[in-house]
Amino acid sequence: MKLSLVAAMLLLLSAARAEEEDKKEDVGTVVGIDLGTTYSCVGVFKNGRVEIIANDQGNRITPPYVAFTPEGERLIGDAAKNQLTSNPENTVFDAKRLIGRTWNDPSVQQDIKFLPFKVVEKKTKPYIQVDIGGGQTKTFAPEEISAMVLTKMKETAEAYLGKKVTHAVVTVPAYFNDAQRQATKDAGTIAGLNVMRIINEPTAAAIAYGLDKREGEKNILVFDLGGGTFDVSLLTIDNGVFEVVATNGDTHLGGEDFDQRVMEHFIKLYKKKTGKDVRKDNRAVQKLRREVEKAKRALSSQHQARIEIESFYEGEDFSETLTRAKFEELNMDLFRSTMKPVQKVLEDSDLKKSDIDEIVLVGGSTRIPKIQQLVKEFFNGKEPSRGINPDEAVAYGAAVQAGVLSGDQDTGDLALLDVCPLTLGIETVGGVMTKLIPRNTVVPTKKSQIFSTASDNQPTVTIKVYEGERPLTKDNHLLGTFDLTGIPPAPRGVPQIEVTFEIDVNGILRVTAEDKGTGNKNKITITNDQNRLTPEEIERMVNDAEKFAEEDKKLKERIDTRNELESYAYSLKNQIGDKEKLGGKLSSEDKETMEKAVEEKIEWLESHQDADIEDFKAKKKELEEIVQPIISKLYGSAGPPPTGEEDTAEKDEL
């Protein structure tokens, strides 16, 4: 099957090359851009090899920061980042964490607490509000900020090439949803670039690793942990054909989250020592952000780092030590969470750990020794490959793909087969999710299926398109809805309605429905304005199907334990207040002791609804230890004492 697929792909490729030959003059030199969260990078395929291009400061990677000075000047890149601490309210970064997301997205709400600039709601999306100089306030969409960064990368390439650049290949996290991909393409358009292809970051990194590897089929696992996003992709590489078998990840996990944990630790420590809350001072927080990031980098090669900040807050200096052990302790849950997607891609691709030929680490955060150790331990001591630069690999792969699209013969026969990260389908009778394209299907792809009407003489069918892994649509995410009308009267089950799903190379979905009897057609393109998924929902869905049973069990256990404590406390309260029961038998001293203990637990419950199972059990045990000796003393040996739970046995509360 794979051979025929490869043959078909190579035929497609040669046809595409012939087509590209005609267009070659139009596109000029196509550049490859890695539009990262914390660094961006641009490369070009020239004279048979990839050149990663240095910016005007001589750096091969550029921070995607945009700043507006009080004088009305706009700075992009290193110059913008360098003045962050003196102008935090008007220095914008992390646009990639906002792009293509809705305002209500929990991660947006979480992020804006820590961003020094103002983020406001506009058209249900997050927009950035800054003072652009001269007392003028302006609001930008995240796409506009990303466009400014893309413009900087474009100009960097133009300065090196000595000519205009109009076409580009731009990378996105493999786990970016449709809205985020579309928004990234829009950013390119705003920057005056024709984004010929959106490719997935781990796939681009695999090209960088495997371009010159021609020794037969290999299974490659790409572990891509950057500043803001995390992807794992499993590919097979075979003589220039790169086939993604499975992908997984988290579009909101990276180096910035590790920095945030350390910052929170020091902010608390500073408050404990001085009683002062530095959160009120934007500049102080940004100074701390800068120094924490430096310390984190230092800890990749040494065991401790000093953090010294002069005139940190209210004229006082800041001086603390961060050890590697403390850094790891603060982030251990995040580090360990990176192993789940690795396990998932192995399961999805039906491969064992021993089947992986190479592990490729990409992204600056893979320099963290603990991350390297966890990956190595997961693969039973196998050493990851160290052959590629983790900062430049993605731009390198994008530049190779750009070379292919510009018709450069030196790229050799390169074919990319990527996948869609989630199952796509439509709702059928009873709210059932009927799957048309399973997750990890190679794209581009097209799939059709015949459906029919559910009742006699039904003139209209409503097509509801969903994304997700659960068997019922109510648990999945609605992408869009459209109607196919004008179906001629007929008994149920007779009309033939063909629904076609088509995903293009950029991962954008188009759905068509056709009444085969009349030739009536209707279609919908799922794009940015369809209110696509938040990454949290994507992450949830992919893992939900398998995790749900386990999660539900844990949740039920927690609720049951909470209810046990609540029922026990209230049952005791009622008995103490009832003269016919305990109330009439207790001494006033014992009664007061029990009342106090019960009230204490009821109050605790009201403010700790979300506590852990262990906490609920511990509180119940505390209450029992106070109550049972009193009741035992009261009842003596006349049978078992009441536990306070007789009234509630076998009754679930509503």
Curated annotation (Swiss-Prot):
The modification Omega-N-methylarginine is found at residue 492. There is a cross-link at residue 352 (Glycyl lysine isopeptide (Lys-Gly) (interchain with G-Cter in SUMO2)). Residues 125-280 are annotated as: Nucleotide-binding (NBD). One of its GO terms (biological process) is negative regulation of IRE1-mediated unfolded protein response. ATP binds at residues 36-39, 96, 227-229, 293-300, 364-367. It is an enzyme of class 3 (hydrolase). GO terms for cellular component: cell surface; cytoplasm; cytosol; endoplasmic reticulum lumen; intracellular membrane-bounded organelle; melanosome; mitochondrion. The modification N6-succinyllysine is found at residue 447. GO terms for molecular function: ATP binding; ATP hydrolysis activity; ATP-dependent protein folding chaperone. The chaperone activity is regulated by ATP-induced allosteric coupling of the nucleotide-binding (NBD) and substrate-binding (SBD) domains. In the ADP-bound and nucleotide-free (apo) states, the two domains have little interaction. In contrast, in the ATP-bound state the two domains are tightly coupled, which results in drastically accelerated kinetics in both binding and release of polypeptide substrates. J domain-containing co-chaperones (DNAJB9/ERdj4 or DNAJC10/ERdj5) stimulate the ATPase activity and are required for efficient substrate recognition by HSPA5/BiP. Residues 409-419 are annotated as: Interdomain linker. In unstressed cells, AMPylation at Thr-518 by FICD inactivates the chaperome activity: AMPylated form is locked in a relatively inert state and only weakly stimulated by J domain-containing proteins. In response to endoplasmic reticulum stress, de-AMPylation by the same protein, FICD, restores the chaperone activity. The modification Phosphoserine is found at residue 86. The modification N6-methyllysine is found at residues 585, 591. Its EC number is 3.6.4.10. The modification N6,N6,N6-trimethyllysine is found at residue 585. SUPFAM superfamilies: Actin-like ATPase domain (SSF53067), Heat shock protein 70kD (HSP70), C-terminal subdomain (SSF100934), Heat shock protein 70kD (HSP70), peptide-binding domain (SSF100920). It holds the Pfam family HSP70. A motif (Prevents secretion from ER) lies at residues 651-654. The modification 3'-nitrotyrosine is found at residue 160. The keyword Hydrolase applies. Residues 1-80 are annotated as: Required for interaction with ELAPOR1. Endoplasmic reticulum chaperone that plays a key role in protein folding and quality control in the endoplasmic reticulum lumen. Involved in the correct folding of proteins and degradation of misfolded proteins via its interaction with DNAJC10/ERdj5, probably to facilitate the release of DNAJC10/ERdj5 from its substrate. Acts as a key repressor of the EIF2AK3/PERK and ERN1/IRE1-mediated unfolded protein response (UPR). The interdomain linker regulates the chaperone activity by mediating the formation of homooligomers. Homooligomers are formed by engagement of the interdomain linker of one HSPA5/BiP molecule as a typical substrate of an adjacent HSPA5/BiP molecule. HSPA5/BiP oligomerization inactivates participating HSPA5/BiP protomers. HSPA5/BiP oligomers probably act as reservoirs to store HSPA5/BiP molecules when they are not needed by the cell. When the levels of unfolded proteins rise, cells can rapidly break up these oligomers to make active monomers. Belongs to the heat shock protein 70 family. This is Endoplasmic reticulum chaperone BiP. It comes from Pongo abelii (Sumatran orangutan). The lineage of its organism: Eukaryota, Metazoa, Chordata, Craniata, Vertebrata.
